[in-house]
């Protein structure tokens, strides 16, 4: 995956902004500082594809109290931005879709990315 399309603003919660680093990576995934080439196990949601559409449709059936914006997946794990966070640096929620009680919160995309690069999941 060399690049990916973001969900358009009309699909996002009012006031929500993607993190700047995420936007840059969407245009060039080689900006991810991989430990080894092609060793990044997460796949970014690519707006306009069936997978991204399905992730978006089912986003609120997972944890209905949260306004989730799906952005990456790795097997049964899905990463979401907190759509209620309008700071421009939203927290990230990673959920095991096979067991939604198994989920983690991260303060930012950069914090999540650091662990994703290390293949923590």
Language-model region placement:
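Compact, glycine/acidic-enriched structural inserts
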Residues: 98-121
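Short, isolated positions within intrinsically disordered regulatory regions of eukaryotic proteins
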Residues: 46-48, 81, 116
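Broad, structure-driven detector of short, well-ordered beta-strand segments within folded domains
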Residues: 77-85
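A short, sequence-level motif marking secondary-structure junctions
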Residues: 84-87, 109-111
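Pocket-edge structural micro-motifs
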Residues: 72-73, 83, 96
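A surface-exposed partner-binding patch
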Residues: 1-77
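Short aromatic-glycine-(Arg/Gly/Cys) micro-motifs in beta-strand/loop hairpins
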Residues: 88-96
